[in-house]
Regions:
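Short, small/polar-rich loop/turn modules that mediate ligand/substrate recognition or access, typified
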Residues: 171, 176, 231-233, 239
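Conserved glycine-rich cofactor-binding loop
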Residues: 8, 15-16
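Residue(s) in the substrate-gating loop at a strand-loop-helix junction
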Residues: 139
Length: 245
């Protein structure tokens, strides 16, 4: 696909469904990875499954100190960070009138604030190297909204706007910042849904099916590549035509 040999990447939420597909896509193209997540045992098992000389760097994105320590820890193990993939995120769904403060705060803290802190830390070595790729996984919900997800929509919409601002700040240093916005992606959670519910979801998608994690991984691998060097401040929507934006 795209040759990432000699490049290094830090990926958050690495062992989840979409995160693992992203890591596999980057590793397949030759990148060396620092995989991050909060479940240490699961993370280490995933790192081992990738083969090669990839490294694991655990992090609790809900804890400020843990977030602040992540980029330095990855730099220590990798030597440099060419690619930052902000994939980790959470949901705490509820109707706005019933949403508790902690449900709002948790989503904003992990999805938006932690990503800001990681971007801030990673941009410094990228600017010094005059090369970098920042790729943030957002969501179609960040553009269209979704009932019961005011907190999640706000966090993902905020990531998109923040990416555009950072892209303008870093462009002159050959550092790009872009988003990939998935629609409905098949995961272990969606597989457990009743057939009628899956059929209803698929009916909303012109392509008639959910996407795969590999679809997101391919988009990330492209944006991480040297070939994507003239693309910045953009969002690639990967949703089977569900929302044509």
């Amino acid at each position: 696909m795209f040759d990432l040999t000699g490049m290094t990447a830090l990926v958050t939420g690495a062992s989840g469904g979409i995160g693992s597909a992203i890591c596999q896509a980057l590793a397949a193209q030759g990148a060396r990875l620092a995989v991050s997540g909060s479940n240490v045992d699961k993370l280490e098992a995933f790192r081992a499954s990738l083969g090669g000389d990839h490294v694991a760097v655990p992090c609790d994105l809900g804890d400020k100190d843990s977030v602040e320590a992540l980029v330095p820890a990855a730099l220590e193990k990798l030597g440099q960070i060419d690619i930052l993939v902000n994939n980790a995120g959470v949901t705490r769904d509820n109707l706005t009138m019933r949403m508790k403060d902690e449900e709002w705060d948790d989503v904003i803290r992990i999805n938006l604030e932690a990503t800001f802190r990681l971007m801030r830390a990673a941009t410094k070595p990228m600017m010094k190297a005059r090369f970098g790729r920042i790729i943030t996984i957002t969501s179609v919900v960040g553009t269209t909204g979704n009932p019961g997800q005011a907190n999640y929509a706000a966090s993902k919409g905020g990531l998109t706007a923040m990416t555009k601002a950072i892209a303008q700040e870093l462009a002159s240093r050959n550092v790009t910042a872009n988003c990939v916005a998935p629609g409905f992606i098949a995961t272990a959670m969606t597989e457990s849904l009743p057939d009628a519910q899956k059929d209803a979801l698929n009916a909303r998608i012109p392509m008639g099916r959910m996407g795969e994690g590999t679809d997101i991984g391919a988009a990330v691998a492209y944006l991480a590549s040297r070939e994507a060097g003239y693309i910045t401040g953009q969002t690639i929507h990967v949703n089977g035509g569900m929302a044509m934006l």
